[in-house]
Amino acid sequence: MGKNFHHPYQPYDIQTQLMEHIYELLNSGKKVGIFESPTGTGKTLSLICSTVTWLREHKLEKLNSKVDNDNLSDSTFSSSDDEPEWVNQFYNDKIMKEKSKSLQEYENYLEGLSMSNIKPVLRQLDIGDRKRKKTVPRHIEIEIEDDETNFLPEPYEQDSVSNQNDYEKGQINDEIQKLLAKIDKGYDVKTENNMELKSPLKIYFSSRTHSQLTQFASQLTLPSFPPSSPTLEKERIKFLPLASRKQLCIHAKVSKLKSDLINDACVETVKRQECQFYTNSRDLISSKQFRDYTFSEISDIEDLVQLGHSLHVCPYYSSRTALEGAEIVTLPYQHILSFEIRESLGINLKDSIVIIDEAHNLMDTITSIYSCEISLSDIKICKKLMKIYLNKFKRKLNGKNRVNIMKLMKLLDILQAFIESHFEKGKEISPQSMFRDSNADLLNIHELVTYMRGSKIAYKIDSYADSKLKSDESNTNSVKQPILFKISKFVLSLSNPSFEGSFFFEEGMIIKYMLLEPNQIFKTIVNDSKCVILAGGTMQPTSEFIENLLPFVPSKDIVQFSCNHIIPESNLDTFIVSEGFNFNYESRNNESVMCKLYDFLLELGCRVPHGIVVFFPSYGYLEHVIKFWQLEEIFEKLSMNKRIFYETPGGSDILPQYSSTILDKKKGAFLFSVVGGKLSEGINFQDNLARAVVMVGLPYPNLYSSELLVKKRHIEQKVISAGGSLKDAKSATIEFYENICMKAVNQSIGRAIRHANDYACIYLVDNRYLNNKVQHKLSEWVRKRVKSELKTSEIFAQTSVFFASNR
């Protein structure tokens, strides 16, 4: 009998295999695990059961170790060999009971809170009428007025130690977080002396969306784990969902601000002692109440917001206080990937387990977070706003502020002139070239960055502009995103190390900074934590992670495992439709190829019941094919067989109509989608919604896009600088290009099977899928079921047999 992972159901073999591999990774001391578990195979529960089982066992070992260490340091205890073994054991048991007593009392207390059906009670409580002893007096909340003095720059000292430290710790796009550092570090609530209630080793679970984190919380309620102490009858999981101020703020006015402004507005409000929620959350009794209510049952972010309202405390700051005792913490990507956010929240990854779910897009996410851009239009708007601000406040600004604002305007003038005179799409540029032909010798980027951080001038100008736009009801040119923050972020990027990223011109008169070395950001996470688990439904090709994200991790410290699917072998067939099909750039617009695709889909529609999802490589090609079929007057015939829905860029959501057609019409429907579009990721095409998934061609990205050209040059330079040949460099860029394509293929066709009883066929329509290298980069559960070297007629025949046997 294998290891008991306390799975709430009888796990499938592949779930057991995944849990065993994760558990072995944690026991082995290796640093990184890359795990692929197809959607619908219970990946989340497998992650929970394996990691929490290990965590509880590890805590028990730590507790026993702590007892032994305490015994050795106890002067009343003799470790002499003359002491009978039963005496030693009796003493150990006594110490264990004493240390477990407080844990049991706390568990009993939490059980009482849980049994009291706390949520309805909290909603009815009138906290204002409750008489409780407060160690910190409550402040009467003062509404933030549009007092014009609030828009003046914050006092700062240009050469102060604090400003210098802020600059040195600055990251690529973390200006906002650095502005919060002072107030965040000043947040100091007294902690309990009871060390047993703390949980130094934690599981941090991060995913892309709020809904995915909420789903994790709901799954966490299903299993039941043994306690970490043998004397405990039961031990509930101490779970804490961390979130941003935008999600947790309950201040009436601050919570309504744009996400780019809310962080600084929070700092401003706290500094002026105008947020009673923050003041109350500094109180020991209130912060403990928030923690205990949170730990009494599995709570999501909405529960924390409700709890904050009920207890009249700030959920954001109170959740940070609860962090110390949490065993499992969920948080969005940005919170785990940004060093500055981790620092401000008090997140210490030392010896902890970091799980990054939906990790197939991890590198793209890191690149996106740490990249920025400004357009010529942004610069012009920013200059206009700064002039309005100067005209309004020039008499109230001191000399230093006026000088620094004028320097910022000078910087904008230089950038505007540079874009207007040097723009060439795709051209890489250096920060030095931006200032080479200007009299920028009087500008010091370091000093400007320090000034912007210390004075919060970006927040001041943006919030003043926002207030004026709101007061002018006739103004229709409201800026959707605070412009000064974009400028501020770009100025910060000018001081980044050149090897980490690159500046280049993008279409639309834009200067873009793009991070090129995401491994530099990820390295601190891997080094600090005990172990990092990268999990996803489609992680192939994993070479992308190993070469570009984890080059600093020795191969012996990386574990890889790819699950098969839980469905029977007979529930999925994968066909390579190669006969006469090649959708490369040279031939895909040939009329014969588009006609052949039409014939294939027409016949397929007669043999596949219900829904068929067809993925095209781009919106442009989808539109081109449909127009051709319409001109040939054959499109209508295809739609007579099955109704056709097709995705358009920026178009309305067609999924509800498609779904209702599948439910209402026996003949079913086609859904023409685009790889990388809204329907290619995150949407479940289960059961009749996708009895077949068709991939038209290989969706290689545009090789001549500015971003891809910059990345290509960077990869080539890296290979050559490491001693590689031109041939090696070329090979590396081809590998990079293929990985982007195959990652997109896997994401799209992974929509086909969503649960154990689902069934479908996958059709890879292009003779290039016969290439072994291409097939090797398919997800393993798809690759194992590939049927190649079949004629189209044989594919249709086997399709009919497949659906006849699966009715």
From Swiss-Prot:
Molecular functions per Gene Ontology: ATP binding; ATP hydrolysis activity; DNA binding; DNA helicase activity; iron-sulfur cluster binding; metal ion binding
Chain's gene name: CHL1
Location in the cell: Nucleus
PROSITE patterns cross-referenced by the UniProt entry: DEAH_ATP_HELICASE, HELICASE_ATP_BIND_2
GO process terms (BP): DNA damage response; establishment of sister chromatid cohesion; nucleobase-containing compound metabolic process
GO annotation, cellular component aspect: nucleus
Protein task: ATP-dependent DNA helicase important for chromosome transmission and normal cell cycle progression in G(2)/M. May have a role in changing DNA topology to allow the loading of proteins involved in maintaining sister chromatid cohesion in the vicinity of the centromeres. Has a specific role in chromosome segregation during meiosis II.
Major subcellular site: nucleus
Cofactor: record remark: Binds 1 [4Fe-4S] cluster.
InterPro entries: ATP-dep_Helicase_C, DinG/Rad3-like, DNA/RNA_helicase_DEAH_CS, Helic_SF1/SF2_ATP-bd_DinG/Rad3, Helicase-like_DEXD_c2, P-loop_NTPase, RAD3-like_helicase_DEAD, Rad3/Chl1-like
One Pfam family recorded for the sequence: DEAD_2
Protein name as catalogued: ATP-dependent DNA helicase CHL1
Organism expressing this protein natively: Kluyveromyces lactis (strain ATCC 8585 / CBS 2359 / DSM 70799 / NBRC 1267 / NRRL Y-1140 / WM37) (Yeast)
Record-linked Gene3D superfamilies: P-loop containing nucleotide triphosphate hydrolases
Sequence motif DEAH box, location on chain: 357-360
Keyword set, alphabetical order: ATP-binding, Cell cycle, DNA-binding, Helicase, Hydrolase, Iron, Iron-sulfur, Isomerase, Metal-binding, Nucleotide-binding, Nucleus
